Amino acid sequence: MDLSSQRQSPNGSRGFRLQAPLVDSVSCYCRVDSGLKTVVEARKFVPGSKLCIQPDINPNAHRRKNSKRERTRIQPPLLPGLPDDLAVACLIRVPRAEHRKLRLVCKRWYRLASGNFFYSQRKLLGMSEEWVYVFKRDRDGKISWNTFDPISQLWQPLPPVPREYSEAVGFGCAVLSGCHLYLFGGKDPLRGSMRRVIFYNARTNKWHRAPDMLRKRHFFGCCVINNCLYVAGGECEGIQRTLRSAEVYDPNKNRWSFIADMSTAMVPLIGVVYDKKWFLKGLGSHQLVMSEAYDPEVNSWSPVSDGMVAGWRNPCTSLNGRLYGLDCRDGCKLRVFDESTDSWNKFMDSKAHLGNSKSLEAAALVPLHNKLCIIRNNMSMSLVDVSNPDKNNPRLWENIAVKGQSKSILSNIWSSIAGRALKSHIVHCQVLQA
């Protein structure tokens, strides 16, 4: 900057001297090197004592900021004739199946229908919808997934499963925050055991990466307690084939941490969270059946040999503090664990035996709308109201999905035949809310 410019600057008359750089902000718009005109304009935004000389600062940055503010001020309303808060109150009532269409209307609707505020308001007002997400494996080992809307009773489209899990085996699946579905670990046919973690956001309908696990593992146990993801045991290629190690992922901290090791190495076969503890049952290093329970409050494992694990079979789940399991191959009977007698008791019977074929086998039992949802390998589902087991209630035990209701009857029959031939089966089943 030349001397004449400094004399003409008001800062010079006040006895201030240009120094570089005294600006304590990351945003500076002065561009002192461009001449007197810029310095004078810079006084509008930067105090005279904090002018700096930074030739790489963009002089249009503040202008763009103002322009953005102006655009926000004059942007059209979400719904013509309505204030935005009232428009949001209307849009959050749109059924979840139509949210994909909302995102196509305009950029403002896209941002709204993809943001946390939109879905937090739906949850606050009791309008969130639970959908069932099902992962299947066909005879060729390919993984596919579908989601079922129990309200419209239709299967909805989903983005493809990421390539790293399209043929993986022994991977875990869990839900955090009600809307994030995680896939983690497993064994890739080419790469072997993995530490990889990815998650699907039901609000945006997209996949994302998450921090890798601390240990490679496959065929391990996993659960969610207090919105933290726990994994334990399993196998890993190498000298120590069966693992004792366990770890936890905290989404708030976005990192994994080791927890106490299991008492013995184990490949878990079934697991459930019950009474604030994580119960696992599986095979030890010498193919012996073993059971352990983890208490997160004291970070310790302990062997279990009571009546619960003695009569424990998969699939099972806990709902409202009670532990339920299936008592029939096709899921037509339910049983419940009675803590007072330390035994499993018969609970409900649909009186509608479907058969013993592989396609009719009940593969998953999950809570849905405060009821129990039974999912079979042929993608048929039954919803059971266990809150009031009144035999006269016609909706006590109802079928909500008959394998692909969006298809014709002929295609359903063909799919059933093809399903038996392909020996496709369900690998994981979860419920996500949005």
UniProtKB/Swiss-Prot annotation:
Pfam families: F-box (PF00646), Kelch_1 (PF01344). Kelch repeats lie at residues 129-178, 180-227, 229-276, 278-321, 325-371. Keywords: Kelch repeat, Repeat. It comes from the Eukaryota. CDD domains: F-box_AtAFR-like. The keyword Translocase does not apply. Residues 76-122 form the F-box domain. InterPro entries: F-box-like_dom_sf (IPR036047), F-box_dom (IPR001810), Kelch-typ_b-propeller (IPR015915), Kelch_1 (IPR006652). GO terms for biological process: regulation of phenylpropanoid metabolic process. This is F-box/kelch-repeat protein At1g55270. It comes from Arabidopsis thaliana.
